């Protein structure tokens, strides 16, 4: 799994040093022979010349998908994806983006998810199960209100998607229930686009999972251009974990070490291009999730078991 895959195209890129590099990471992932590849958003980077036209949007997808280093991975395993702002439109875009239906249409054509929305609910939303792990893939853009709205309670998921998520989690019989969403959830700091910028909905999500007694929940997120594992202790029940994994080939956020996320598990901050593996083991009733994070060459940087 990974997020933030920027593929250079000089004619459309910013001047100076190319933003994307380290494409060999895709071969390193391929060499691990994963059963599935989970793309955590910003899987493409729409440029200013792309997001206003169908031609531009489809060019960006085909340009990214044509990368030679990507071909073995694309052809060798199952792929599931969520979207984030750069898949949808401009940087930090929200549900007000005028062309979101066209970018959603392109997402549907280039990703083979089981569904794109649930019933009449629109967006890049779906779920799938792999063994005793179930994945709930959310859309954090389609219903999102702009940060800083003052006359309404802001939302990332919207009521319909929020209610569906809680119902689906409650109904799930899976040992591991992964909530997959672009931006960080547990980090309590309201920085950039973390869920903490939407405090009412953020609190309601954590409280509802706790009050409903939903077992086995963990968050998988991208976006931040660094990797870390966060752990939220909860009174009387198991802790919630969040694995943030980023970037694949985009630039690295140099300020991550000084961002004092109080929930960060010591020794898990990674400030280089990387990907993560999730491995499941153990007998029924005694299952273990092992997380390992690897650099662009495939070298293991850290591992933790939950």
Where are these regions (language model features)?
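Metal-dependent phosphoester/phosphodiester hydrolase catalytic core
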Residues: 1-306
């Amino acid at each position: 799994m990974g997020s933030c895959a920027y593929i250079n195209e000089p004619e459309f890129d910013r001047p100076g040093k190319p933003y994307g590099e380290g494409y060999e990471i895709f071969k390193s992932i391929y060499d691990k022979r994963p059963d599935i590849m989970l793309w955590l958003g910003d899987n493409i980077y729409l440029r200013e010349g792309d997001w206003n036209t169908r031609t531009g949007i489809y060019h960006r997808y085909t340009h990214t998908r044509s990368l030679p280093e990507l071909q073995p991975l694309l052809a060798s395993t199952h792929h599931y994806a969520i979207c984030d702002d750069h898949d949808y439109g401009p940087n930090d875009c929200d549900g007000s983006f005028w062309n979101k239906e066209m970018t959603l249409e392109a997402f549907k054509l280039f990703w083979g998810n089981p569904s794109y929305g649930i019933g009449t609910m629109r967006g890049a939303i779906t779920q799938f199960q792999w063994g005793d792990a179930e994945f709930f893939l959310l859309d954090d853009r389609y219903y999102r209100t702009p940060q800083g709205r003052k006359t309404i309670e802001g939302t990332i998921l919207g009521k319909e998607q929020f209610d569906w998520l809680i119902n689906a989690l409650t109904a799930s019989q899976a040992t591991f229930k992964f909530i997959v969403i672009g931006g960080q959830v547990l980090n309590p700091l309201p920085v950039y686009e973390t869920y903490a910028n939407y405090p009412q909905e953020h609190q309601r999500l954590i409280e509802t999972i706790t009050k409903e007694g939903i077992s086995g929940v963990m968050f998988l997120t991208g976006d931040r251009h660094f990797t870390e594992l966060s752990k939220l202790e909860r009174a009387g029940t198991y802790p919630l974990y969040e694995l943030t994994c980023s970037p694949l080939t985009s630039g690295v956020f140099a300020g991550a070490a000084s961002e004092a996320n109080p929930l960060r598990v010591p020794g898990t901050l990674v400030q280089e291009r990387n990907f993560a593996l999730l491995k499941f083991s153990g007998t029924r009733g005694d299952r273990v999730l092992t997380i390992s994070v690897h650099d662009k060459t495939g070298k293991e940087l850290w591992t933790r078991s939950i």
